[in-house]
Design a protein with these regions (language model features):
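Generic C-terminus detector
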Residues: 286-309
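A C-terminal functional module that forms or caps the active site or interfaces directly
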Residues: 232-267
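Conserved N-terminal catalytic core of the sugar/cofactor nucleotidyltransferase
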Residues: 1-4, 27-124, 131-132, 136, ...
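Conserved core of the sugar-phosphate nucleotidyltransferase
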Residues: 133-222
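Short, surface-exposed amphipathic charged segments that create phosphate/polyanion-binding patches used
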Residues: 93-103, 167-172, 285-289
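Hydrophobic packing residues within well-ordered alpha-helices of enzyme cores
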Residues: 60-64, 139, 232, 290
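Conserved nucleotide-sugar donor-binding
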Residues: 221-232
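N-terminal nucleotide-binding beta1-loop-alpha1 segment
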Residues: 1-19, 23
């Protein structure tokens, strides 16, 4: 089955303190998205679509694209590589972007920018997260079961495997019904492991609500068919129409759209659970830990000495 891996890499890592999407972190300078690409191709994916800022094109081709040119799919074919640009030129003409706005419009707009390149079932992920080998195998198999419209899937991770020792994180806390289907995702903005070993939302105070370690959370690892693009387009336009004049930071987020479609009965999303250790670089201080974990995976033979052909 042909399937596309769509990687969102245009965002600015403000808390991280740099461009974490292209920060070399593997033993040979690999960046985190190279591990996702490697795992996806092994699982059966046939196309990679990078969503980037236009000025990142040369950098991305040099760091990742040129290595992909030598890679093959699981069937021995060449990997199709596409670059989609997320910038303000793709915003509908009826909306005038404030001249002071720098921040991109969020994950709905990002995915919408890849529309012309995606004509097959696809998975969309963050560029700066490590998702684990088995997660790609599981979601690839699930993609083949999706109807042409009205169905999707996601990988849910245990909350305890997704927090940082160096500060709070934002996670999409998933409410899953008895049938293993997603009811809703609640964006929770200040999750932190505390001194007593419990994970709390400390948005209001240090003794905020406690979350169970195995609480399923979304790390933006979604699977859909191209049917979703019509919904993305309509939702983004409604978002822009509702923005106050001069708004500089508000984003249009994929989990919000998915929740609305579920509430309207237009979408059902299966939740695939993963007990894998997710890791990423929310903060610059996370880098050393991620480097250690990746080296362990190479040493254990999960990955070859180098990911670059």
């Amino acid at each position: 089955m042909k399937a596309a891996l769509v990687i969102m890499a245009a965002g600015m890592g403000s808390r991280y303190g740099g461009n974490k999407q292209v920060d070399g972190i593997g033993p040979n300078g690999e960046i985190l998205m190279e591990y996702s690409i490697f795992d996806a191709l092994r699982a059966g994916f046939t196309k990679v679509v990078f969503i980037i800022k236009p000025d990142m094109r040369d950098l991305m081709e040099n760091m990742v694209g040129k290595h992909l040119a030598a890679r093959k799919t699981a069937d021995g074919d060449n990997v199709e590589v596409c670059y989609a640009y997320q910038d303000f030129s793709s915003v509908p003409d009826f909306y005038e972007v404030p001249s002071e706005r720098v921040k991109p419009f969020g994950t709905v707009h990002a995915l919408l920018c890849a529309r012309e390149f995606v004509h097959e079932p696809f998975v969309v992920i963050n560029a700066d997260d490590y998702y684990g080998v088995d997660a790609f195998k599981t979601i690839y198999a699930e993609l083949s079961k999706l109807a042409e419209s009205g169905e999707g899937t996601m990988v849910g991770y245990d909350l305890c495997n997704t927090v940082s020792e160096h500060g709070t994180v934002t996670r999409g806390v998933c409410h899953v019904n008895e049938q293993g289907m997603l009811d809703r995702v609640v964006e929770t903005f200040h999750l932190k492991p505390c001194a007593d070993g419990k994970i709390r939302d400390i948005q209001e105070d240090g003794d905020g609500p406690v979350y169970a370690p195995e609480t399923p959370v979304s790390m933006n690892f979604w699977g859909f068919t191209p049917w979703l693009f019509e919904k993305l387009d309509a939702y983004f336009k409604d978002f822009l129409r509702a923005l106050p004049d001069g708004e500089l930071k508000k984003e249009c987020l994929l989990p919000s759209l998915i929740g609305e479609l579920i509430d309207r009965g237009e979408l059902s999303v299966s939740v695939l659970r993963s007990s894998a250790r997710w890791f990423g670089m929310t903060y610059h201080e996370d880098k050393e830990m991620v480097q250690r974990e990746l080296q362990k995976l190479h040493d254990a033979g999960v990955y070859p000495k180098t990911l670059r052909a």
